[in-house]
């Protein structure tokens, strides 16, 4: 019982930090220049993206590809006329960072 309580307490401390770290990564990689959490701007909101991908088995893989290569290269979904630029037009995002970002978006 003590171990379970300690683990639960540890998770309460660690998980919010992980969520904040992913949000910071999204900000550091300038994703918020086009996207916002709840409202559409130049690009769809993260909540709209999460809703679109909800329940799709290939969501994370497809999102990672789009985050890394841009939507034109991957044939990814397009909202309105906005397309995700490739990494020549924005900060470099590693494979691991793209996975973190995709997982964070899917939790929105």
Please identify what each model-predicted range represents:
Residues 16-21:
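N-terminal signal peptide c-region/cleavage motif recognized by signal peptidases
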Residues 90-93, 102-108:
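Short, exposed beta-strand-loop hairpins at the edges of beta-sheets
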Residues 1-9:
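Bacterial N-terminal signal peptides that target proteins for export
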Residues 64, 95-102:
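Short, amphipathic alpha-helical "lid/cap" segments that border enzyme active or binding sites
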Residues 30-37, 101:
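The canonical Cys-X-X-Cys-His
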Residues 27, 36-68:
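Gly/Gly-Pro-rich "capping" loops immediately C-terminal to redox-active cysteine motifs
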Residues 23-25:
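Immediate flanking context of iron-sulfur cluster ligation sites
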Residues 33, 44-51, 69-97:
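Axial heme c-ligation environment in periplasmic c-type cytochrome domains
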């Amino acid at each position: 019982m003590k171990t379970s309580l300690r683990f639960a307490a540890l998770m309460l401390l660690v998980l919010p930090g992980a969520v904040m770290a992913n949000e910071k990564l999204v900000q550091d990689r300038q994703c918020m220049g086009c996207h916002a959490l709840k409202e559409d701007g130049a690009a769809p909101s993260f909540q709209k993206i999460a809703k679109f991908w909800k329940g799709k088995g290939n969501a994370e893989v497809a999102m990672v590809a789009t985050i890394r290569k841009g939507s034109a290269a991957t044939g990814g979904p397009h909202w309105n006329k906005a397309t995700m630029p490739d990494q020549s037009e924005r900060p470099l995002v590693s494979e691991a960072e793209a996975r973190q970002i995709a997982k964070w978006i899917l939790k929105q």
